A protein has these predicted regions:
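HIT superfamily nucleotide-processing domains
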Residues: 1-129
Length: 129
């Protein structure tokens, strides 16, 4: 069973913020900032592409609601979302991170420095997509 399934079945404890038959939202155990939440389907879909459309719609409705609630509670400078698939999905269960951002929080994007210097290089890299 995945961590999310264990939380849904109450086999492990979590700070649950929202739950329906299809979606659960709970506090991340290793948060980037206060208010860092995970939103996931209650069933074990592994990747983004596996989630049925109606469940995905509900997930996005929950994300929108939680965005408003996080914004109201924490008054952040911004709110970020992250979602990983394949070997970068460390839970083996589709989930989306949502967390408040604050100036100076030191969370950032590290450039891979691919060397794309102009629009033509960028266009060529995406040909056939």
């Amino acid at each position: 069973m995945t961590i999310v399934e264990l939380i849904v079945s109450r086999e492990i404890d979590a700070v649950i913020i929202f739950e329906s038959a299809n979606v659960i939202a709970f506090a991340d155990h290793d948060p980037i900032n206060f208010g860092h939440l995970l939103i996931a389907p209650t069933f074990p879909y592994e990747n983004f592409i596996d989630v049925p459309e109606l469940v995905f719609i509900e997930i996005n409705e929950v994300v929108r609601d939680l965005y408003r609630r996080l914004d109201s509670k924490f008054n952040p400078d911004g709110i970020s979302f992250i979602q990983n698939n394949g070997k970068f999905n460390d839970l083996g269960h589709y989930h989306l991170h949502i967390f408040p951002r604050f100036d100076g929080d030191k969370f950032g994007w590290q450039s891979s420095n691919l060397g794309i210097q102009n629009i033509n290089d960028l266009r060529k890299s995406l040909e056939g997509l």
